[in-house]
Amino acid sequence: MLQNEVENFANLLEQATVYLAPYQEKIIVVKYGGNAMINEDLKKLVMQDILLLNQLGVKVVLVHGGGPEISQGVKLLGKEPQFINGLRVTDQDTINVVLQMLAGKVNKSLVALLKGKGVGLCGIDANMLQCEKLQAEVDYGFVGEIVKVNTQLLELALSANLIPVISTVGVDDQGVAYNINADTVASEIAMALGAAKLVSMTDIAGLLRDRFDESTLIPEVEVSEVQGLIDQGIIAGGMIPKIACCTDFINAGGIEANIIDGRVPHAILVSLFGGKNGTLFYKK
């Protein structure tokens, strides 16, 4: 490496250290999904960035979904995937696909990209995600809601400087497996671990005043403003539960939560290094 290249690298590393100082030896929970998970090039970049953060002393917990793979598996059974109010209807065949694809294929493919630093887990392991059947006006089948997060296994992995990669399957006290919303899992784990930051990767630019115009991005929202934005219809539909996960985390003591655009290369690093990506939620 030439002298000027060494100097440039040293300067970049110094700048990165300044931005990462608030997160040194702290926990960041990343909910990973959307286009960044489907696009193979973006997927590799995300895993590279998480590896870099790990090497720089940030403790990253990765929570992932796997909607497209699950839908593909359901279609192979001759069924059409069903969704009501944004939640997947999960019958017995579908939960079997979830276990096979989400906790199996998808999880292990991500772990492999972390080059020996990842450890693949699902919520069933060591009763990490204890849940019960979701009670709603609609019967969603094997869809669960979390009643307790057991952090022992996660803490063990983090203390060994490993990156937990968690698929969003939980288990009830009878040993029945349930599919759980990934944003909810990420938020609950972040709260249970006392994480400093929650990051949710999406397929949109962030919270928009006009959902058809990305130039109307709202870069920052103080949590007390959220209800007003709901009343105005700016936060609507699937963004309501996603943002609720962010505000729950912050109100429980988290420093900040980001909804970021996963279509942007190095989206996680951009959000941590002071760049403009997505919407930041915080509390005064």
Curated annotation (Swiss-Prot):
Signal peptide: which range, if any?
A: none
Q: Which SUPFAM superfamilies match?
A: Carbamate kinase-like
**Listed GO CC annotations:** cytoplasm
User: Which pathway, per its entry?
Assistant: Amino-acid biosynthesis; L-arginine biosynthesis; N(2)-acetyl-L-ornithine from L-glutamate: step 2/4
Record site feature (Transition state stabilizer), residues? 31, 242
Any single Pfam family the record assigns to this protein: AA_kinase
Q: Which InterPro entries match?
A: AceGlu_kinase-like_sf, AcgluKinase_fam, ArgB, Asp/Glu/Uridylate_kinase, Glu/AcGlu_kinase, NAGK-C
Keywords, ordered alphabetically: Amino-acid biosynthesis, Arginine biosynthesis, ATP-binding, Cytoplasm, Kinase, Nucleotide-binding, Transferase
**Which compartments does it reside in?**
Cytoplasm
- Broad class of where this protein is predominantly found: cytoplasm
What's the superkingdom here?
Answer: Bacteria
Under catalytic activity, the entry for this protein gives: N-acetyl-L-glutamate + ATP = N-acetyl-L-glutamyl 5-phosphate + ADP
Provide one Gene Ontology biological process annotation. Answer: arginine biosynthetic process via ornithine
Gene Ontology molecular function, alphabetical:
acetylglutamate kinase activity; ATP binding
Instruction: List residues binding substrate.
Output: 66-67, 88, 179
Q: Which HAMAP family match?
A: ArgB
- Family under the similarity heading: Belongs to the acetylglutamate kinase family. ArgB subfamily.
State what protein this is by name.
Acetylglutamate kinase
From what organism does this protein derive? Answer: Actinobacillus pleuropneumoniae serotype 7 (strain AP76)
